[in-house]
């Protein structure tokens, strides 16, 4: 990308500046160099304005800081400007810098506690099957569909979001499906993006360490719907909050797995009597765009909902209903989302990202209809995060699985024994579960004890390829561990 002129960039905010060339925008002073515009704002944990002098010392071309009437900027040898409400305007600033890439794309925003990654990948997969070139941004990675690069956060900074969109547009993407987290919405990271469609999947307990209450968490999610015209909103009518929002947004598209949606005059998309089998599901689709049978190679009732969410977004964007039905059997299962390993002579192990009580319950319920033997659940909880959901996670495992193994997830700086104690507190019969802190050994234990008719849900990490113990982020993958343990098990049969 050619350099941008400082004066042109600042003119959008009524600031007069000289025509210095800018090559990048940085929020982290450690990444600043010649050509950088250092943007100094108050973060959730740290005030970036404390590092203005460090950025200047590292060669920054200019500084733009958050003006609040109290902060006094240091005297610098480079241009240094203050701007009120800078965090809320950062998406706009980055949009101007990167020449508004989202205006040249179909941009689908997806929010909700569960299902964001799967829905985003299904949208991108569908666009690819129909002959386009689609990008993905979210927890599972950023990049063109089929070539994702690991992402640090579900929704990056406002600057990262615009930079990623620009990169995808330059690579030829004509559609981008983007997970939008509640954090990202509250922190205005997508405030200036012209979304073509917005999807709400569901709301259940998560991130209360940040939002405080479920009401605040739900209000954060609703911000995405406010960024699109009402007919471009796609809302889950099976979700309690979704039903409330459909009353407030009567022109939105409603989708659901439980048949016709009552008291909604807008467009609808529903599944009727889905049939589940080992290869996926088949279901009758009734919609405002037409009716037909949809088959997809995905496990579980909640994936019927995810497919409907993705299909709703595609229909809002103008894609053909019959073409979507015809291509649905070619949709690809998502890495680390109800991903199957083994089977046959060995137990079937299913790796899934379920890390909330609601997601864990849905995953276990989904697998129960496929299970001829015992249903196992291996699960842990992260450290330095919402303690309130730990007993709920254990309770869900105990309620819906026949055999439970509790193990470590990402303990971070918290004592694994304390995390485990919080989980055990949610059990009715603590003596009925097994505890193995070492996640590798826990997976090996489950596979060694299960029969070939059994299904083992390995929950919590999904696609992740790391484990955080203390402050050490080390390589670890449930998918790799399960595959290796199954290989060893199969060798023992020969």
Show where each model-derived region lies:
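Active-site beta-alpha connecting loops in nucleotide-dependent enzymes
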Residues: 43-46, 334, 358-361, 365-428, ...
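N-terminal leader/targeting and accessory segments in enzymes
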Residues: 1-92, 96, 240, 293, ...
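Short glycine-rich anion-binding loops that position phosphate/pyrophosphate groups of nucleotides
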Residues: 43-44, 182-183, 205-206, 239-240, ...
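Receiver (REC) domain switch/active-site residues of two-component response regulators
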Residues: 61, 196, 402
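Short acidic-hydrophobic, aromatic-tinged amphipathic segments that line or gate anion-handling sites
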Residues: 80-85, 434-438, 442
């Amino acid at each position: 990308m050619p350099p941008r002129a400082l004066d042109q960039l600042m003119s959008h905010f009524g600031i007069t500046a000289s025509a210095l060339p800018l090559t990048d925008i940085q929020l982290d002073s450690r990444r600043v160099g010649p050509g950088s515009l250092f943007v100094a704002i108050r973060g959730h944990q740290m005030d970036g304005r404390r590092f203005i002098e460090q950025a200047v010392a590292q060669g920054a071309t200019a500084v733009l800081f958050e003006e609040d009437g109290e902060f006094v900027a240091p005297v610098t040898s480079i241009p240094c400007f203050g701007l009120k409400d800078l965090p809320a305007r950062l998406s706009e600033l980055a949009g101007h810098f990167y020449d508004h890439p989202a205006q040249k794309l179909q941009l689908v925003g997806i929010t909700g506690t569960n299902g964001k990654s799967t829905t985003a990948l299904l949208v991108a997969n569908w666009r690819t099957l129909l002959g386009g070139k689609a990008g993905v941004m979210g927890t599972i990675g950023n990049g063109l569909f089929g070539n994702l690069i690991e992402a640090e956060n579900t929704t990056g900074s406002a600057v990262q979001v615009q930079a990623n969109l620009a990169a995808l547009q330059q690579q030829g993407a004509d559609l981008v499906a983007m997970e939008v987290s509640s954090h990202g919405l509250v922190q205005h990271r997508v405030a200036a993006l012209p979304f073509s469609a917005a999807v709400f999947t569901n709301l259940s307990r998560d991130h209360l360490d940040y939002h405080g209450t479920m009401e605040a968490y739900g209000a954060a999610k609703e911000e995405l719907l406010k960024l699109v015209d009402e007919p471009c909103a796609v809302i889950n009518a099976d979700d309690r909050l979704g039903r409330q929002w459909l009353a407030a947004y009567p022109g939105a598209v409603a989708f659901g797995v439980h048949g016709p949606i009552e008291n909604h005059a807008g467009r609808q998309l529903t599944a009727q009597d889905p049939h589940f089998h080992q290869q996926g599901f088949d279901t009758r689709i009734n919609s405002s765009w037409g009716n037909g049978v949809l088959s997809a190679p995905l496990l579980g009732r909640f994936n019927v909902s995810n497919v409907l969410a993705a299909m709703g977004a595609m229909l809002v964007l103008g894609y053909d209903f019959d073409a979507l039905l015809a291509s649905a059997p070619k949709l690809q299962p998502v890495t680390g989302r109800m991903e199957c390993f083994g089977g046959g002579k060995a137990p079937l192990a299913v790796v899934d990202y379920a890390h909330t009580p609601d997601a864990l319950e849905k995953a276990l319920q989904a697998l129960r209809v496929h299970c001829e033997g015992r249903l196992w659940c291996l699960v842990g909880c992260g450290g330095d995060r919402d303690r309130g959901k730990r007993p709920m996670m254990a309770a869900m495992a105990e309620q819906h699985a026949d055999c439970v193994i509790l193990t470590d997830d990402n303990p971070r700086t918290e004592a694994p024994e304390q995390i485990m104690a919080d989980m055990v507190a949610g059990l009715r019969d603590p003596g009925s579960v097994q505890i193995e802190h070492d996640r590798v050994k826990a997976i090996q234990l489950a596979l060694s004890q299960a029969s070939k008719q059994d299904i083992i849900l390995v929950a919590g990490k999904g696609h992740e390829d790391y484990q955080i113990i203390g402050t050490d982020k080390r390589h670890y993958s449930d998918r790799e561990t399960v595959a290796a343990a199954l290989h060893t098990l199969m060798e023992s049969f020969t």
